[in-house]
Every structure is written in C-alpha cells, then in structure tokens.
C-alpha cells in the first residue's frame, strides 16, 4: 500500500502572552484538553523533557480500524522553553511541532505542524489535525482571557 510523506501546518494568533501559553502547554495533563482524539495523559516522571514518554488514551467512538479508548505513546523529542516543543505519536506515526512567537505582550502566534506518512485516502484527517488543535487551544485560551 503506497503512502505519502505529508506535512500540514496551521498558525493562529491567540490573546495570551507567550509565557501563559507555554505554562499551559508545558503541563502534560492539559494535552487532552486541546489535542484531538486524546482523552487522558499519563506522563512519565520527567514531564515535558526530551526523551520523556507519555501514555495516552484516545477518546471517541470505535471505528472499523480503531477501538474506542485505544492507547498510544507520545515521545517528547525537543523542548525549547517559551519557543517550541516537538513530539512523536507512535500509533499514528506522526511528528508534531508546536511553535510560539510573541506578537506583543498579550498576543502570541501559535503554529502547529504535523508530518507523517499516510495513505492517500487518509490524507484529509491528518491534514486537519493542526487546525482542530488550534481551534480547541483558542477556545481554552480565549475563555481564560475573558475571566
């Protein structure tokens, strides 16, 4: 079965400082709040550090090829505090990169990129991951900013 190496990237400006966003993103347990398809996270003792391995439990309904609440593993690849973090999702064979760029004191541009090999018929879903993740992150950040 033929696969293609594909990279999908989306950016969004959020009403929060880079420090506030980093504080939220650096907490492993928050990943399930904004990353699509993750119901819970069990980080190892290292937390957000290169080489750390987090156990993930997916949410959602079962499909022909996926059980409900399937497990996955995340491996943290690189951490540059306040700037970027990258990780690998083993089950999906996805490399994920999240980058933060301060626009001013209270606004930050967040870029989410995913790369991996997918069969052509599956390209729609992986390409949409950055957009869905940013939409969920935006909803969380904007709600917190308005409190």
Give the residues covered by each predicted segment.
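Hydrophobic pocket/interface hotspot
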Residues: 20-25, 31, 56, 76, ...
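Beta-strand/loop substructures that line and gate deep hydrophobic ligand-binding cavities in soluble
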Residues: 84-143
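Short, surface-exposed charged micro-motifs
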Residues: 11, 75, 97-99
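Glycine-rich portal/gate segments that line the openings of hydrophobic small-molecule binding cavities
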Residues: 42-95, 132, 140-147
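A short, structured loop/turn motif at beta-sheet edges
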Residues: 18-19, 46-49, 77-82, 99-109
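Hydrophobic-ligand-binding modules of eukaryotic lipid transfer/binding families
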Residues: 1-13, 103, 107, 131, ...
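Hydrophobic ligand-binding cavity/cleft-lining segments
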Residues: 1-49
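Hydrophobic beta-strand positions in extracellular immunoglobulin-like domains
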Residues: 14, 60, 114-116
């Amino acid at each position: 079965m033929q696969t293609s190496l594909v990279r999908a990237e989306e950016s969004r400006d959020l009403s929060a400082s880079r420090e506030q966003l980093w504080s939220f993103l650096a907490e492993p347990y928050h990943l399930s709040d904004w990353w699509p398809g993750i119901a819970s996270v069990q980080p190892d003792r290292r937390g957000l550090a290169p080489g750390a391995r987090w156990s993930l439990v997916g949410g959602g309904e079962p499909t022909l090829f996926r059980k409900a609440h399937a497990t996955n593993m995340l491996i943290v690849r690189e951490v540059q505090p306040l700037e970027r973090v990258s990780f690998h999702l083993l089950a999906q064979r996805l490399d994920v990169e999240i980058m933060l760029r301060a626009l001013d004191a209270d606004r930050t541009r967040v870029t989410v990129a995913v790369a991996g090999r997918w069969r052509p018929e599956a390209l729609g879903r992986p390409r949409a991951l950055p957009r869905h993740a940013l939409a969920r992150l935006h909803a969380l950040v904007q709600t917190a900013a308005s409190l």
